[in-house]
Amino acid sequence: ERRRLLKALSLNLSDISLNERNMCDLELLATGVFSPLDRFMDRSDYESVLDRMRLQNGTLWPLPIALDVSETTARSLEVGQSVTLRDPEGFLLAVLHIDDIWPVDREKEALSVYGTTDDTHPGVHYLYHRSGDYYVGGAVEVLSPPLRFDFRQNRLSPLEVRAMYRKLGWKRVVGFQTRHPIHRP
């Protein structure tokens, strides 16, 4: 019922077209991979993550997850407004209920996240040259996660991963992150 209501509501809402990086973040929010985070961060969580690597509630969180938009888009938005999130082809993915809009502090984010402001670092380069000038935070109601056709057998939700562990009889699992993790698009 809620899904049908949101689809009808979406016809009268402004749209934000997501880039690949934003779609990845939306997918991870939608599938619970970013749990307990279930929304694009507001400024207070964003600042808290940059300053202490924790959400405002104290939960350890190493990277900011906020929706970047252009200055033109940001100026057309208001706190309290709902907008649709669409893929580059215009397919409806979600409705975002905006809680916060703020300008990006690129230098602070680069130093906090990457430990450098060196433009040759791929993450810093993306932040300085491809990321939007503003962040938008708020609750997301996902209608359809982004469609993916590559590596489908590896795109598992946390529930599916836990079911796989049970099926395999695994009691203990070790996680490992490389020193140089794969960079997001």
Task: Label each region the model flagged.
Residues 1-185:
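Non-catalytic terminal extensions that flank enzyme cores
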